[in-house]
Amino acid sequence: VVGGKPAKLGAWPWMVALGFHNYRQPKKSPEWKCGGSLRISRHVLTAAHCAIHRSLYVVRIADLNLKRDDDGAHPIQMGIESKLIHPDYVYSEHHDDIAILKLEKDVSFSEYIRPICLPIEESLRNNNFIGYNPFVAGWGRLRYKGPLSDALMEVQVPVVRNKVCKRAYSDVSDTVICAGYPKGRKDSCQGDSGGPLMIPQESTYYEIGVVSYGHECALPKYPGVYTRVTSYLDSFILPALKK
């Protein structure tokens, strides 16, 4: 996350870090290189471009600082039983960048760990979210080509009309949602991929996007691009959660 601030303990109890093997140093602890969000009991929603790697093998749920044990968080680390990648996703392209991980076992919810809601209600399902200022959170880079963050960071970015977003990225379609400021400065970045774009409604958070791609990070006129969750509810997400 670029231009954000450290998240407070318990702010995002559905945040998941995705851990990858480093094959060159197999004894090393996981490399936390993507994000995701907890769904009911044992599934994680993330980006296909994260899930597709064979080196992905573990998740850590509801951590705050990935390197410290004294941050007050009570994270759970768990293996992955199976991965469901959107059938139309192609690694060299950006479309249909969505996947669901099924965990080895059910996650017990607590004050620290709970799932984020899907935008299933009509008022959300048919919303393009223009005028909203959603949050994005992750352990990704603090600037383009900069270091990954050990601390969970958060930032708010305004939703941009797809027409405007198309000026930056020609392949933008209705199945994505773009967010960022005209002057840049605040954005998700590499390592935040798969994490949630979130809006509060009353006191409940809903996930409206999944971090997908962007040109570098936080550049003027180049918003971040997110997979639009409402576009995939019936065709992919809800059926995948039954598996």
From Swiss-Prot:
CC annotations in GO: extracellular region
Keyword Hydrolase part of the UniProt annotation: yes
PROSITE patterns per UniProt: TRYPSIN_DOM, TRYPSIN_HIS, TRYPSIN_SER
Expressed in which tissues: Expressed by the venom duct.
Active site: 49 (charge relay system), 97 (charge relay system), 193 (charge relay system)
First-listed, main subcellular location of the protein, grouped into a coarse class: secreted
Gene3D superfamilies: Trypsin-like serine proteases
Compartment list: Secreted
Span of the signal peptide: none
One Pfam family hit: Trypsin
Group of enzyme by EC: hydrolase
Superkingdom per UniProt: Eukaryota
GO BP: proteolysis
EC code: 3.4.21.-
Cystine connections: 34-50, 165-178, 189-217
Domain Peptidase S1: 1-243
Keywords on record: Allergen, Disulfide bond, Hydrolase, Protease, Secreted, Serine protease
Recorded family membership: Belongs to the peptidase S1 family.
Protein name: Venom protease
Organism: Bombus pensylvanicus (American bumblebee)
Phylogenetic placement of the source organism: Eukaryota, Metazoa, Ecdysozoa, Arthropoda, Hexapoda
